[in-house]
C-alpha cells in the first residue's frame, strides 16, 4: 500500500515501536500473518515488520475518522494490559469504551441494558475479545484488531500486526492510533510537532505500584510538612527572644 509522504513512518515513531517491543511476534505464524514477518531470530521469535504495522495503523485511523459520530466507534479490551489504553483512546477520540468483561449479547440482544449498535469495533486481542468479534459478525459490524502473528483472523477486517501481549506494545499502538485519528480529524494540524500527550499515559500501571508510589509521596509530603513546622517554630522562638530582649532594653 503506497502512502503519501505525510503518512510515512518517521524515525521517531520507528524508535518508539522498537523500544516498546512491538516488533517481537510469536514463534508460530498464522497463514494470513505471513506477509508481516520481517525475519526470524535464532531463538525462533519472529520479527514483525514495523513498516507494515504503521501502514495498518494509518489505514485503521482513516476508517475511524470516516465515521461522523465518534461514539459509534467501540473500543474493546478484556485484557488487563489494554484496559487503560482503551479508556484513554476513548477519552481522546470520543469512542465508546468497553474495558473489562464483555457482556454477551451487547451487540445482538436488544433487551440487555448493555446493548449497543456501533458502526465499528476495535479490539485488543482476537482471542480474548472473541465474543465481541463473533457478535459483530452476526450484525455486520467491521472489526479492527491488534493481532499477533499467531492470532486468529476470522471475522477481522483490518489486522494491525503487533505484539499484543506486552503492556508497552499495546499502549503504544493505541496511542499512535489515537494520534493519527486526531490528525485526520484536524485536531492536530501540524504533523511536524509532537503530540502533547505522552505514550506513558496509555501504558498499564500495576495498582499496587500506584498505591506504593502514592504512599511514598504522602510520607515525603508529611516529612516536608514537619520540617516546615519545625522551621516555623524556630522562627517564632527567635522572634519571641528578640522581642524579650528589646523589651528589657526599653525598660532599662
Curated annotation (Swiss-Prot):
Component of the small ribosomal subunit. Mature ribosomes consist of a small (40S) and a large (60S) subunit. The 40S subunit contains about 33 different proteins and 1 molecule of RNA (18S). The 60S subunit contains about 49 different proteins and 3 molecules of RNA (25S, 5.8S and 5S). Interacts with RPS21. GO terms for molecular function: structural constituent of ribosome. This is Small ribosomal subunit protein uS2A. One of its GO terms (cellular component) is cytosolic small ribosomal subunit. Gene3D superfamilies: Glucose-6-phosphate isomerase like protein, domain 1. InterPro entries: Ribosomal_uS2 (IPR001865), Ribosomal_uS2_CS (IPR018130), Ribosomal_uS2_euk (IPR027498), Ribosomal_uS2_euk/arc (IPR005707), Ribosomal_uS2_flav_dom_sf (IPR023591). The keyword Cytoplasm applies. It comes from the Eukaryota.
Amino acid at each position: 500500500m503506497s502512502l503519501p509522504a505525510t503518512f510515512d513512518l518517521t524515525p521517531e515513531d520507528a524508535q518508539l515501536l522498537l523500544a516498546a517491543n512491538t516488533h517481537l511476534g510469536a514463534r508460530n505464524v498464522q497463514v494470513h500473518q505471513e506477509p508481516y514477518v520481517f525475519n526470524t531470530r535464532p531463538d525462533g521469535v519472529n520479527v514483525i515488520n514495523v513498516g507494515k504495522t504503521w501502514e495498518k495503523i494509518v489505514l485503521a485511523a482513516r476508517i475511524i475518522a470516516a465515521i461522523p459520530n465518534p461514539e459509534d466507534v467501540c473500543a474493546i479490551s478484556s485484557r488487563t494490559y489494554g484496559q487503560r489504553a482503551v479508556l484513554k483512546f476513548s477519552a481522546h477520540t470520543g469512542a465508546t469504551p468497553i474495558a473489562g468483561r464483555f457482556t454477551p449479547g451487547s451487540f445482538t440482544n436488544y433487551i440487555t441494558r448493555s446493548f449497543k449498535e456501533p458502526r465499528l469495533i476495535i479490539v485488543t486481542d482476537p482471542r480474548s475479545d472473541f465474543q465481541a468479534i463473533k457478535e459483530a459478525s452476526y450484525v455486520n459490524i467491521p472489526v479492527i484488531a491488534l493481532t499477533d502473528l499467531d492470532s486468529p483472523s476470522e471475522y477481522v477486517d483490518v489486522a494491525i500486526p503487533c505484539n499484543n501481549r506486552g503492556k508497552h506494545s499495546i499502549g503504544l499502538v493505541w496511542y499512535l492510533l489515537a494520534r493519527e485519528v486526531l490528525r485526520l480529524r484536524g485536531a492536530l494540524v501540524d504533523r511536524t510537532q509532537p503530540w502533547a500527550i505522552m505514550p506513558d499515559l496509555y501504558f498499564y500501571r500495576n495498582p499496587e505500584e500506584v498505591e506504593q508510589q502514592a504512599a511514598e509521596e504522602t510520607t515525603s509530603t508529611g516529612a516536608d510538612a514537619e520540617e516546615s513546622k519545625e522551621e516555623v517554630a524556630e522562627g517564632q522562638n527567635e522572634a519571641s527572644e528578640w522581642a524579650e530582649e528589646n523589651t528589657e532594653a526599653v525598660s532599662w
